A protein has these predicted regions:
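Acidic/histidine-enriched segments that form metal/cofactor-coordinating
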Residues: 121, 137-155
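C-terminal, helix-dominated tail/subdomain
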Residues: 162-173, 181
Length: 214
């Protein structure tokens, strides 16, 4: 009644965005600033969200850097003690290309070169040899816990339902999504890591500590 006089709006359909291929060369950039410690960030192009390729990369990145039982944390922080923190995660995007991130923070007063080299060795090992069945099972359990925690809250559950309604015109998919992830095999995760998470496909950002003038 209040808006009946307004003309209807017929939005144009946005054309699908072609996904970007993985980088074919390493792209690096260095930035200096007054940061607490030196750090290195890695980035990769990943498949669009809600595909088996993205979900498998998400599990692979969880194996690599999801929590204190992950490869990066266990090797760099606990075993070699060359970093104060290390982790990895995936960022899902529906428009063409998602991306994955890994990061390491150096020890206070040191540059990140040693931690970066150790991280690249772990990234290469994952891309070359793949994860173990036990690592994939842990990553799935972690994903399931986070997913069910989100569904247990009415506000985040509503957000997920609206997400699948808006992005895929399929709100019921929220009930199937966990099964899609749980059905991925270790071989599938290894295949995704080899295809999208190799060291030679990365972008790298190095944060260096700026010299103190005092």
């Amino acid at each position: 009644k209040a808006f009946g006089h307004l003309p209807s709006w017929n939005p144009k359909t946005r054309p699908p965005v072609a996904p970007l291929a993985p980088l074919d060369t390493v792209v690096t950039r260095q930035v200096s600033g007054r940061v607490p410690v030196a750090a290195t960030y890695f980035g990769w192009r990943l498949p669009v969200r809600d595909t088996w390729g993205f979900d498998a990369c998400d599990l692979a990145l969880s194996v690599l850097g999801g929590g204190q039982t992950s490869r990066l944390y266990r090797e760099l922080v606990r075993n070699q003690q060359v970093a104060t923190a290390a982790g990895a995660s995936a960022v899902p995007l529906v428009g063409g290309t998602s991306f994955g991130i890994a990061q390491v923070r150096a020890l206070p007063g040191q540059d990140a070169a040693e931690a970066t080299e150790a991280a690249l060795a772990e990234i290469d090992r994952l891309a070359t040899d793949g994860p173990t069945d036990a690592e994939v099972a842990r990553a799935k359990a972690q994903h399931a816990r986070e997913w069910l925690t989100e569904l247990a809250r009415f506000d985040s559950r509503a957000d997920l339902i609206s997400t699948y309604a808006t992005l895929h015109d399929d709100p019921e998919r929220v009930n199937r999504k966990l099964d899609e992830v749980m059905s991925l095999t270790t071989d599938r995760v290894a295949e995704a890591a080899s295809a999208f998470l190799r060291p030679d496909q990365r972008a790298q950002l190095d944060y260096q500590q700026e010299a103190d003038d005092a």
